[in-house]
Amino acid sequence: MAKTAAQPKTMESNHKVASVLSTGLFAILCVLIAFPLLAGFFASFQEGREVVMKGMSLNLDFSKMHLDNYKYLFSGNEDSRKYFMWYKNSLILTLITVVLTLLVCYFIAYGLTMYKFKLQGFLFFLVIATMCVPFEILMLPLYNEVTSLGIINTRAGVILPGLCGASTIFFFKQYTQSLPKELLDAGRIDGCTEYGISVKIMMPITKPAFASMAILCAMGSWNNMLWPMLVFRDTSKFTLQIGLNTLLTPYGNNYNLLIAGSMFGILPILIIYLIFQRYLIDGMTSGAVKG
């Protein structure tokens, strides 16, 4: 009887210990993630040479902080015009990539989930298998293919190779599996076409999945630097990440524009997250559990 009474107390004690450990680990991770962002943010209000000499830290001297870096960023001089040209290129490329990737991956996942056909499982296996292949292995064949198609130095050359993302297809497939198949039959009875069912009935239901993937796709496209650097040749087509990298030269570095421009470059992703954050958790949890 004493053992039975002591068992719940032991389980409760273990649960408290686990809760404290997990909370502490989470707090440490938050500090590690937040430190570079906070240090970079405060560094953007300091002289670039001072940041390079002393390094970025949270040991701040507010008397030396100023807005000169951001004034230079918005001054309209040659460096400022280049920066916002790269900024515009990144915005356009990210918008096109997100829209096309979501639509293509949704229809692929929808077809793999809602219809039965030969080699269905094998095709899905091939999709998942590509997740195990590092991009660096595919980079040279993709570059040769883009060159042979004549789309080098174009946005199409950057967008098309990554249009059918395996992880995005997998997420959409897991989400659509949780949707009731009776909706398809109801749509067919009402005379709706297969395309109409997928667009007018099923697509609105998958709004949380679209929002979740929009955030992840936007982050991936906005931060992508390696592949656009290989494809683009003209500086007028550079994205923000490539353009900022050109500010680092053996002959001198424009740290004022680099630091302030890096901080200002976070803004689009932050706005996208704030817009779609309420759908993010719903999309992740609904897609992870088949109802």
Kindly give the residue locations of the regions a language model identified.
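A structural signal for multi-pass alpha-helical bundles of membrane permease subunits
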Residues: 8-291
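ABC-family P-loop ATPase nucleotide-binding domain
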Residues: 1-8
